[in-house]
Amino acid sequence: MPRVVIFLSWLTADRLLVEGRAWKLGGIKPSSTVQSVKAFIQASTRMPISQQRLIFAGRQLENPITLAEYNITHNSVLNCVIRLVGGKPAIYLLSPQAINKVSVSVELSREWDFAVIYPLADKSQNSKFSTSKVTWNVSVDSTGILREASGREYSYLFWEAETQPATPMIDDEMYNRFNAARPILTSSNSVVLPFHDFIGYLEMTLERLQLTVSMRTDFMTYWMPNFLHIRDQGLDIAVTFVEQSMFNKAARLSITPQPSTVARVFMLFGAVDTTDRDENDSEWRNLRLDLKEANDIDWAMRIGLDVKGLKDQRAFRAMEWGGMEVYDV
């Protein structure tokens, strides 16, 4: 049976993921399913199957169908559109006394849409500039436990979102807000560390950003499989945090009554090759940061987080954390 070589051009939203480069997949047969091609891509690039959309001749390919059924032949070119995921933004409400009625809403910009919401809530479209909005109505007690009208109790409000097909943007929008479909993780805005230094550094950074022990534990356990996968590839980890004012324009958080302090900690991270090999021509070459230099960075100041306000246990406060792995670094 003839074997097929497929050249994939990688796209994130509307731009090439790697300029001028295509992944060449060998060992693919006409009888191979779309699912098996995605599995090969996942093994080669770490991109989860669930976040891949394969496009051929303007048509999205379905997992169970074979390449032959789509008339994909030798040297065919597929586009792989990546769905980036904003992982587990969790909203905590902290109050010294019970508040009977609290309304919490999140409204997303057009670049992404809700994939998971918990507690369950109805989505609504709020404006032409937004994909959707969700609102929760809860009470909060002095221990931070949230209660719905049904009496069910929760530790936090949870939402997760996936990026959508690209939409036109004007320059002002692009440079003044976080764009979930085009997250920016560069050598100039991030810290690069090997895994064995990174984990302790991240734990310390989260503590400085005023996440409680419970929040830090949830954060680390949620992202640890991704960090371990990067380590197992022999790569280092680049990390940055999104400025709060920019993130607010991509995911507007509204809380009534208004807390005295609202903190939104959203991490971007990705795998990078910092080795000094001749074939490594990336911007990350030799860019591992000394741990002492990394420890000197004041992330709270960089992202505009009010540390003093968060420490005031006499006040009503809100804390949200989340993150996103960036694959085109």
Ranges and model annotations:
Residues 85-329:
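Protease-labile, long low-complexity intrinsically disordered regions enriched in Pro/Ser/Thr
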Residues 1-87:
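Ubiquitin system architectures
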